[in-house]
Amino acid sequence: MPGCLIKCSNVYVDNTGREIVSPMEYETICLLGTNCGLEDPDDVARMNEIANDLGVDSIELGATIAVLMDAGKGDFGDVAFMKEVTSEMMAGSENGKFYATGTARVGEALNFKRVPVIKKQAISAYDPRLIEVTGISMMLTAQGADHTVGNAATFKCDDKNVEELVAESLRMQINAAVADSFGLCVFGRSVTDENLELIANAINDAFDAGVTPDFIRNIGVETLRLEAAFNNAAGFGEDDDELPAFFLEEPLPPTGKMARLYSREVNAAMQNLMEAQSL
């Protein structure tokens, strides 16, 4: 984008300099790459290109293929199998239509239990056994397992209780809702999250609007309320916020950590926090 100082995008080329895909992003590298056992970044780029041509989400596609592999339908690291799956999807075959239903429904149909989804949406690169604030955000958000609603990948969780983790998740979710509402750069949020006055001043200078930092923060709070109300009206409940059981039962190498986050406890902590803050 002209004038952008961060320049987060990239162009991935082959050994002749021909563009394969642009951009190749972190989540795609994880879910379509290491998650599926790929070691050659060129293979990841070509799978990314296929996902783009299909118009499917690379996170969901990578998680779906990995579940198929984990269930014994293919071998980890087998890029030919991955291309076979996407070829079936592109052809619209019965298998392809099945694969296109996504991670949750493929796992259910195979009666497979290690399916990393929340509200039937695939979890991205952030394992809730280790990155707990992001795990809470993905549990509570109306948007399914969406890491962008309140990601705190570097937050030190080990010495925090659930209430403290929920408090950080709420703070991040409000900031993310503000950024999404105003179209603020996710990488610039290390500045804007901590300085709502800067945003208010910029808006006021441009539009003579007279908004305050509290007004901007309240937009984030109201966005979260509206999203939650929508999901409640659609029939979602507390049980839909649970992590998949294997996160609670299987230790994550090499740390050996298991998830300690349960929907009832997390929801109660969030409710208490919002009441205490009069939100």
PLM regions: where:
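Extended C-terminal regions of large enzymes
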Residues: M1-L279
